[in-house]
A protein has these predicted regions:
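Active-/binding-site microenvironments in catalytic and ligand-binding cores
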Residues: 1-212
Length: 212
């Protein structure tokens, strides 16, 4: 069984506020040019993507410097469903989950159902204590079915990257904008989230899948 965990990359897809817009258009077509080719303009963190430590640390590892083992491995789904707008995910959602034997934690909130809407910006988010727990259990990569590892600020709220700073220490990898985590029906799926091999990159889109 193979389950696609990726949003379709297309013109106008929702991005983090302030990031470059995604534009995909025809460059060549078979009727005039014998072949179909697209022009793709987008930021490095568009759609379903991974984030390297270089995103938040000037001396952090760039994506092409990260071991490929961080992008494939045994996954475990953490159930963080049923939460409210901008709610901090309770720590017990993490510590009550058996993550032994996994290297990739997938945090399921089902917030991906709001992708493309303003409500998607009001996603839940973890706290440092929960991230510390995952690291203590050997999790190297965390993947989310929402916009950002940190709270995306609403009007009048302060901007923070505290969770990014913490997780990105020690080569931690973040996956954002995953979808369809509810379709994973086994305890330990194999996860693949290999990024484009962009040199000197802070991140890149992925075609993420779960299989078993």
């Amino acid at each position: 069984m193979i389950v696609d965990l990726s949003h379709v990359l297309q013109t106008g897809i929702q991005i983090y506020p302030g990031d470059p817009e995604v534009e995909i258009k025809e460059a060549l077509n078979v009727e005039k040019d014998f072949v179909n080719v697209l022009t793709v303009n987008m930021g490095s963190q568009s759609g379903t993507h991974v984030v390297s430590p270089f995103h938040v640390f000037a001396d952090g590892k760039k994506l092409s410097e990260v071991e490929l083992s961080h992008f494939v491995g045994t996954g475990v789904v953490i159930d963080a469903t049923g939460l409210s707008d901008r709610q901090e995910i309770p720590t017990d959602r993490f510590v009550s989950t058996d993550v032994n034997g996994a290297s990739i934690a997938l945090v399921r909130t089902d917030w991906s159902q709001y992708f493309g809407s303003d409500k998607y910006l009001a996603h839940p988010f973890p706290n440092i204590e929960s991230l510390e727990y995952l690291k203590s259990k050997g999790i190297t990569t965390i993947a989310l079915d929402f916009l950002s590892l940190d709270r995306t600020p609403g009007a009048g709220e302060d901007f923070t990257l505290a969770n990014h700073y913490f997780w990105s220490q020690g080569d931690g990898i973040i996956g954002e904008n995953f979808t369809n985590l509810k379709a994973i029906s086994v305890a330990r799926p194999h996860i693949s989230m290999l990024p484009l091999n962009l040199g000197a990159s802070d991140g890149a889109p992925v075609r993420a899948i779960a299989s078993w």
